[in-house]
Amino acid sequence: MVLTGEELWSKVREGLQTKLSKPTFETFIRPTACSGFANGELRLLAPNPFAGVRLREQLLPSITQLASEACGGPVQVVVLADSAVVSPGVTNQDADPPEPASAPGDSAAARESAPSRSPRRVLPGLNPRYVFGRFVVGPNSRMAHAAALAVAEAPGREFNPLFICGGVGLGKTHLMQAIGHYRLEIDPSARVSYVSTETFTNDLIDSIRKDGMKAFRDRYRAADLLLVDDIQFIEGKEYTQEEFFHTFNALHEAGKQVVIASDRPPSQISRLQQRLISRFQMGLIADIQAPDLETRMAILQKKAEQERMALPRDLIHYLAGRFTSNIRELEGALTRAVAFASITGLPMTVESVAPMLDPTGQGVDVTPQQVIDKVSEVFDVTAEEMLSSTRRRAVSQARQVGMYLMRQGTDLSLPRIGDTFGGKDHTTVMYAIEQVEKKLASDPQLAGQVQKVKDLLQIDSRRKR
């Protein structure tokens, strides 16, 4: 009997289910799919690079043996992840790629040299993962996302230049590169150039040294869409500012689109020529703020779906509440959690992951009783009232704040927090936390009370140690 790839993999999985622990099977085997079987070679697609490494380094002998037994002959097993064979050195699929050392490429010329490949894969500097479809839009980024999409669809018309600013790790580079990808999908002949300010400066210095300024200017001014990242690093570089000013003018006057990213607005970049500030402000300045709780949860959920990882909602809520400053930190925490589960074989739960994310225990040494005591003190209710089922407004608000701070200051899971408050369901706890998050942004009095409790419990200082 000749087996198809799916049939063979199904038989192998049945055998592995009896040999492996349930956490190992559920984390690494169940999400793995068969991508092909031909000429004695079984190709498996792991859900993420960590799973791929685990399969290759620890589970491959068992998989090969079971596959060979099912086929009645030798079978070679190849494990892939993210459309590429995983090597043992692969650890982080979403790590930022190194800055390209070369000058920005002419995408049309690049495609002519490799006609069989997608434009996304050949344009120097563009990360294939930084596309609009992978960007989670929240209140913090809605305007920037809408402006980026408008620029990608109709460059050189509105919002020229588009200046995207925001703190580290909030998605500026993602949005900027998504513009380039989307533009190439609409118009494969478009000349799209993505460059960091550092690369622009280095190219300029190199061109001066080699007496190649004409080629430098021709290369940058030939772009239909120029994407310039980290423009704040132009501060104090007078000659670079001079050259960029003329490059900007040439493109703008020709109706070409310029998109700029910075960690601050133009007016706050020190030692930046006033005429450049004026040019940057003539279009649209779109600010990206830190994401709120709901957006952080959506980011983790989307990443989990993209990586085909089964994450408990409780763990998603924990990570989203624990890492609040930027998206890169948030995704880094998820990466560490997945790696930890991959290495140890432990299930992806708050209880197993939290100690790894805070190995000193200094960020989470507040007890539930301490939270209840301090909240009742600041909000002028009794601890007994907080733990009761009364719906009096003052008590309900104190109870919600208690749940919120218990999540902030301890490693208790949502069900455990619910148990602390008289057996409340975990969805009730989640709702309470989300309500407090929303109110903190619009209610200064509540924000002050919450901060007072935090100060008494030293929650923030513990996290910084």
From Swiss-Prot:
InterPro entries: AAA+_ATPase, Chromosome_initiator_DnaA, Chromosome_initiator_DnaA-like, Chromosome_initiator_DnaA_CS, DnaA_C, DnaA_dom, DnaA_N_dom, DnaA_N_sf. The keyword Transmembrane helix does not apply. Residues 81-124 are annotated as: Domain II. Residues 107-117 have a biased composition (Low complexity). The keyword DNA-binding applies. Residues 125-341 are annotated as: Domain III, AAA+ region. ATP binds at residues 169, 171-173. One of its GO terms (cellular component) is plasma membrane. It holds the Pfam family Bac_DnaA. GO terms for molecular function: ATP binding; ATP hydrolysis activity; DNA replication origin binding; lipid binding. Residues 342-465 are annotated as: Domain IV, binds dsDNA. Keywords: ATP-binding, Cytoplasm, DNA replication, DNA-binding, Lipid-binding, Nucleotide-binding. Belongs to the DnaA family. This is Chromosomal replication initiator protein DnaA. The gene is dnaA.
